[in-house]
UniProtKB/Swiss-Prot annotation:
EC number from the UniProt entry: 2.7.11.1
Function as written in the Swiss-Prot or TrEMBL entry: May regulate flowering time by modulating the photoperiod pathway.
Lineage of the species this protein comes from: Eukaryota, Viridiplantae, Streptophyta, Embryophyta, Tracheophyta
Nucleotide-binding recorded as keyword: yes
Annotated ATP binding sites: T108, E109, L110, F111, K158
Annotated organism of origin: Arabidopsis thaliana
The protein's name in its UniProt record: Probable serine/threonine-protein kinase WNK7
Stored InterPro entries: Kinase-like_dom_sf, Prot_kinase_dom, Ser/Thr_kinase_AS, WNK_Ser-Thr_kinase
Catalytic residues as annotated in Swiss-Prot or TrEMBL: D175
Residue numbers bearing the Phosphoserine modification: S505
Pfam families noted in UniProt: Pkinase
Amino acid sequence: MEGSEDASAIVEPPDPEVLEIDPTCRYIRYKEVIGKGASKTVFKGFDEVDGIEVAWNQVRIDDLLQSPDCLERLYSEVRLLKSLKHKNIIRFYNSWIDDKNKTVNIITELFTSGSLRQYRKKHRKVNMKAVKCWARQILTGLKYLHSQDPPIIHRDIKCDNIFINGNHGEVKIGDLGLATVMEQANAKSVIGTPEFMAPELYDENYNELADIYSFGMCMLEMVTFEYPYCECRNSAQIYKKVSSGIKPASLSKVKDPEVMKFIEKCLLPASERLSAEELLLDSFLNVNGLVMNNPLPLPDIVMPKEGSFGERCLMSEGPPNARNRTMSMNLDEDNNLPIVISSNNSGTNCIEVRRAKRGNFFVLKGEENDENSVSLILRIVDENGRVRNIHFLFFQEGDTASNVSSEMVEQLELTDKNVKFIAELIDVLLVNLIPNWKTDVAVDHLIHPQQNQSSKDNHQNGASSQAGESISHSLSSDYCPRSDDEANPTVAATTEDQEAEKPGSLEEEEEDERLKEELEKIEERFREEMKEITRKREEATMETKNRFFEKKMQQVE
């Protein structure tokens, strides 16, 4: 009990500077932004267990799903950070996907002094002893990467991607988003920062020694405070000089002959260039080191399979959990009606569909991403307590529920029997979210009139009309009793004919009109009351089901 009280006590942010807390309540995110890139923002965070500051890297899921290149870089970075453990490679703690805020979060160690480029520009008067120490640490990290089987090529070594803790001169290699595992003798793709790219990179035929060339350019930047080839105005000019063997103008500014000699060793043609291990033996260099940490068991980011759908989906998976195993949606059988919940999040209409199938629980959430696409999250808890999440964009023009469902079943390695089930979930959600949505599969039997606001009025009007007809018939019987003559069709017909021949008085016509109005009012009142009773019944039913479900879901979260 004491432990649970402590945990609940830290769920609320401790101060206004805290914007977010991770699912394990271990890490907190502050307002302070310490770095920002094209797709990633880095905030200062804090590890409340170890009492240390951390870097909280955050990427918006919708941004990733619309840029396959950024998504691939993220997967590459997470995969490599998790697999690499070395004193000169940035330390990885944890990663997870936040379904609610639609972000990918990666916790790494914090470098209080920022990148080596920032640090060097801030501290211009630094003894060469310190520069040599930094160089040795970078090479030690590269040696580790290049010694993997198969070797890992960073492909974007530069001072912007090397980080430092200035209080004790600790340097580590980071930003592994462009790194690649060299499964063949030579890599082929052209990628990196032009100012730091080796000539062979432009020829699309290179190996790990391309990182050594980039390291040489880092050394040049550290001693001259200039980006290599800053005299060039664009990438084309840089390429022309590099391919022609022309060195950057800043190399002529290096006054120390030992430094010049060392940099030139790194910039030699690939066939003559020394490896990181060989350069570490150079008397020019020095040494330093540090320790590591172990990650928490948070839901894991999972690599999708190859294919067009894999390029626009993001998946995570959590380990089996005994509490997940006991989760119940309070649904009695496989063929039950799905629970549909409508909410409004900051002006955006959100729909959630929940349904059970043979011990597995499916929750599909969706909201309009823009006028052409819908952002969807499918969460599956299986009978063993394993939780899987898949985020994806549904394009209204080109996608169908069946096609997307088939792709998802393949990605999640589910049985083909789930294709129709998930397709029904998707179309039920879209019917409730998008006006006049044309379904791909039959879902009329699954849509309840009162389950969501978007379709509530249309379905409710239909139900009310039927109820109204029933009430009208009942009222006609109750308030317009038949005479004995009316019971006999022949007599009734004769009576009607006779009445038609008689000129009715104005008073009688007015009396009939008033009676008709009164009856219509009664019918309208009962129709409205019936609608209200139906609405209250559905609200009470949904509230009860949701209360039981949310209680179980909180245990999973």
